[in-house]
């Protein structure tokens, strides 16, 4: 019976590590739309925009550039609004305006 309990615990630990991996990569810059695709960044994006005295409309949420400060929650800070659109820099690279 003990062996059957170990397997579910190991599976839960593996899933927890996968969930924790859905954060931005420290030091990279991200478009809002890419942060939303990575994980549950809606509240953090709104908070970063409000802290920077920026509007929280869809355009600013999706087309602003944010810096990944890192930490357990993948903390972010607002860099700028990309009026001409935010561009995906590709995997492992910073996004840009």
Where are these regions (language model features)?
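Extracellular low-complexity, O-glycosylation-prone Ser/Thr/Pro/Gly-rich "stalks"
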Residues: 25, 36-97
